[in-house]
Design a protein with these regions (language model features):
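Conserved beta-alpha-beta core of the PfkB/ribokinase-like small-molecule kinase fold
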Residues: 131-209, 227
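Hydrophobic beta-strand scaffold residues
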Residues: 51, 77, 157-158, 219
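Conserved phosphate-binding/catalytic region of the ribokinase-like
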Residues: 1-5, 148, 200-289
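Conserved N-terminal subdomain of the carbohydrate kinase-like
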Residues: 50-130
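Active-site metal-binding loops of divalent metal-dependent hydrolases
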Residues: 10, 161, 255
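Short, conserved phosphate/pyrophosphate- and ester-handling motifs at nucleotide-, phospho-/glycolipid
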Residues: 44, 191, 253
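Short beta-strand scaffold segments in enzyme catalytic cores
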Residues: 42, 89-93, 227-231
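Glycine-rich phosphate/adenosyl-contacting loop at the front of the ribokinase-like
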Residues: 1-75
Length: 289
């Protein structure tokens, strides 16, 4: 089994407990561990995988809480670095349909430097799923250097852009950076919104056709309750999900990618049916997460 190596932000999600309330109107919040890369690592480990996380948190009570969370999930925290800057926060409210309202307050996550990371030498799958990895600062430089390292080592590379409109009022740079990562990744997981935004198209099939892809790259476009649009080996098919009531979609995409990557860590798929089975299982994991 390969180790899933996740790099990016680990943060505190302050989640509104006021039902169907915007952040403007929310009063009550609970604290939860958050950050897409960490969520993906947790998803992988809960399914029996082996994950490691690389990122930076504050040397404060919140950073300690985040480390304890990863340790409880048996995730390798050798590359969880503590900073004198405060831990990053995200404030989240949940609407009636399960969709989210976000505000980010960046902190230590953007200060991760490449030289601080002890990189795996073999048997690794690299996952780039950071929502803040393209925003500048040391993390952005580290993100791109880690991609180059993974390419040099010929590791399997996974990319999830995790677009947040609140972070990108002007998304041109996000689109440029995402296209670069898409062209160099073996697995690309996108939401429908992300696929259309990055491609500049209005149709998902056209969007996928515009991407510059590696040979045998897997593209998964998640469609919520409608399943996942899967592209692999020039074949395109919607893989259905199971029907559940949407209460909170926070982390569902991370649960999905973690489930796909756990299976890839066990065995790199060789044909469409094998990938389809991976995605079908991941759809179910995401639906009940």
């Amino acid at each position: 089994m390969k180790t899933l190596f996740c790099i990016g932000e680990l943060l505190i999600d302050w989640i509104s407990t006021d039902i169907d309330s915007s952040l403007v109107d929310s009063v009550n919040f609970i604290k939860k561990a958050g950050g897409a890369p960490g969520n993906a690592a947790i998803s992988c480990n809960r399914l029996g995988g082996k994950s490691a996380f690389a990122g930076k948190v504050g040397n404060d009570a919140f950073g300690m809480f985040l480390k304890e969370t990863l340790v409880k999930e048996d995730i390798d925290t050798e590359n969880l670095i503590f900073s004198e800057h405060p831990t990053t926060f995200a404030y989240v409210s949940i609407k009636k349909d399960g969709e989210r309202d976000f505000i980010f307050m960046r902190g230590a996550d953007e200060l991760l430097e490449f030289h601080e990371i002890k990189l795996p030498q073999e048997n690794a799958v690299f996952h780039f799923g950071s929502a803040t990895g393209f925003l500048g600062g040391d993390l952005s430089e580290t993100y791109f250097k880690a991609l180059d390292y993974a390419l040099e080592k010929k590791f399997f590379i996974s990319f999830d852009p995790n677009f947040r409109e609140a972070l990108w009022p002007n998304p041109e740079k996000f689109i440029e950076f995402s296209k670069d990562f898409i062209s160099k990744s073996d697995l690309i997981k996108l939401s429908e919104e992300e696929a259309l935004l990055i491609s500049g198209k209005k149709d998902l099939q056209e969007a996928i056709a515009t991407f510059k892809l590696k040979k045998n790259a897997i593209v998964c476009v998640t469609l919520g309750k409608n399943g996942t649009l899967l592209y692999f080996q020039e074949k395109l098919e919607i893989v259905p999900s199971i029907s559940v009531e949407a209460i909170d979609t926070t982390g569902a995409g991370d649960a999905f990618i973690g489930a796909v990557l756990k299976q890839i860590c066990d065995k790199t798929p060789e044909n469409f049916d094998e990938v389809k089975n991976y995605v079908s299982f991941a759809n179910k994991v995401a639906a009940i997460s």
